[in-house]
């Protein structure tokens, strides 16, 4: 029996006031519908039907490379009509799980509980109890058994008092679902084909109807405008921050941390305020991350420190390495054990060896730097000739004086010393001292120019 997931994603989202389809608006740097797709995969979906309509080109440009069956809903005539568009892709023996592209916080554990609650060939619906159920379809029960769902606009006064509401998420048997969808009518206040009407049909057919509920109501909330989108973002971030704290991270203020990807943390990690963590990030034990730092797709070793306002992107910090404040590690940069870069140092496609240091104001690109090297302030690896990039190699225990330019390709041998202000254009042998400064001149009797008076 295959698990066939149908995701409804055809709506425009007029209240978003955006040309972007509603389901492509992001939560934690990932579209709402992508969150739903990922959750569908995590519960073991065998196939995913994406019902689309508005903004087809934008949807396909964002999601097109994934294993999805694209199902067009040319007219938006209700949720029942939307699901019916996928009928040709639903097998009689399938379990059909219906999800929504604008409900991004639904948890895999909740869906697993829903699927587990479904009896053989039965219908399972996800419900939630709300103190204020205004606007939602109500779950109608008789003798505690579900017999139907009535929408807000069609509900009687007695039914409006019900606080158990329909989330729209359900699991149904494929054969019966297709039959029920074929019987839907638009004879209602909205003039639409309600998916919820299949519940009464299931009851009439004697099908067992069971329910499950999410751990939190926020899981089943959608976003129809940007205020609701922001509320979902905050809920996502609160949940992500809680997960980090349970895994061993100390958060200076959980409300001032943005997590936009998959983060793994070790024990006794300290994260200060206004940090952004994006993509796949691995953080070791006893790591300190300063205020305002940005970490993107990077690996941080044990006992490392990222000082305030540093950016680490597609880069690695080894054990006890440190960066910042105001340092930038660009893609391909790596600090080996106990290496350090300080304020306003930028690295790209470069390795700084064990115990080596670049304290401040340097650019290190396309470079291999050995152990115990000192890079003085203002040092630049001149790696680009206008057409191609070239490599700078600095071997162990080299001292590079301040304001030195290394014109690649060039190799500096072990233990060499480069005098401050030098421009190095050829290889330097092991142990050599190289100075390329112009000889200093002393001009006595020289008078500084005097400014002309303003007219």
From Swiss-Prot:
Residues 227-247 are annotated as: Linker. InterPro entries: Bifunctional_GlmU, GlmU-like, GlmU_C_LbH, Hexapep, Hexapep_transf_CS, MobA-like_NTP_Trfase, Nucleotide-diphossugar_trans, Trimer_LpxA-like_sf. It is found in: Cytoplasm. One of its GO terms (molecular function) is magnesium ion binding. GO terms for biological process: cell morphogenesis; cell wall organization; lipid A biosynthetic process; peptidoglycan biosynthetic process; regulation of cell shape; UDP-N-acetylglucosamine biosynthetic process. This is Bifunctional protein GlmU. The active site is at residue 360.
């Amino acid at each position: 029996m295959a698990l066939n997931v149908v995701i409804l994603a055809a709506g425009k989202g007029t209240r978003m006031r955006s040309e972007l389809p509603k389901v492509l608006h992001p939560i934690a740097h990932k579209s709402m519908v992508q969150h739903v797709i990922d959750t569908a995969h995590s519960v073991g979906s065998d196939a995913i039907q994406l019902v689309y309509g508005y903004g087809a080109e934008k949807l396909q440009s964002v999601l097109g490379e994934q294993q999805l069956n694209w199902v067009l809903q040319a007219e938006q005539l209700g949720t029942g009509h939307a699901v019916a568009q996928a009928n040709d892709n639903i097998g009689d023996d399938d379990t059909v799980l219906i999800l929504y592209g604008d409900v991004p916080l639904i948890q895999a554990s909740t869906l697993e509980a829903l699927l587990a609650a479904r009896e053989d060939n039965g219908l399972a619906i996800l419900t939630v109890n709300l103190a204020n159920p205004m606007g939602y379809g109500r779950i109608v029960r008789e003798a505690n058994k579900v017999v139907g769902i009535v929408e807000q606009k069609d509900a009687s006064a007695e039914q409006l008092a019900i606080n158990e509401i329909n989330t729209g998420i359900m699991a149904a048997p494929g054969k019966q679902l297709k039959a029920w969808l074929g019987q839907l009518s638009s004879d209602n206040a909205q003039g639409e084909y309600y998916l919820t009407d299949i519940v009464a049909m299931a009851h009439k057919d004697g099908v067992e109807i069971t329910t499950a509920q999410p751990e939190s109501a926020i899981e089943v909330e959608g976003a129809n405008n940007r205020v609701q989108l922001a509320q979902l973002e905050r809920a996502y971030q609160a949940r992500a921050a809680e997960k980090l704290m349970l895994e061993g991270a100390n958060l200076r203020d959980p409300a001032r941390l943005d997590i936009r990807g998959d983060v793994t943390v070790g024990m006794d990690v300290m994260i200060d305020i206004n940090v952004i963590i994006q993509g796949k990030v691995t953080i070791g034990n006893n790591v300190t991350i300063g205020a305002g730092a940005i970490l993107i797709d990077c690996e941080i070793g044990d006992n490392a420190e990222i000082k305030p306002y540093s950016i680490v992107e597609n880069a690695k910090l080894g054990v006890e390495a440190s960066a910042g404040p105001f340092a930038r590690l660009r893609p391909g940069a790596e600090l080996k054990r106990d290496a350090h870069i300080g304020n306003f140092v930028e690295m790209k496609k470069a390795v700084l060896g064990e115990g080596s240091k670049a304290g401040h104001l340097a650019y290190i690109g396309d470079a291999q730097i050995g152990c115990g090297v000192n890079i003085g302030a203002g040092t630049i690896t001149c790696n680009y000739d206008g057409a191609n990039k070239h490599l700078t190699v600095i071997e162990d225990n080299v001292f590079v004086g301040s304001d030195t330019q290394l014109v690649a390709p060039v190799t500096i041998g072990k233990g060499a010393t480069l005098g401050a202000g030098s421009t190095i254009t050829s290889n330097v042998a092991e142990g050599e001292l190289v100075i390329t400064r112009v000889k200093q001149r002393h001009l006595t009797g020289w008078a500084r120019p005097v400014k002309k008076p303003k007219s």
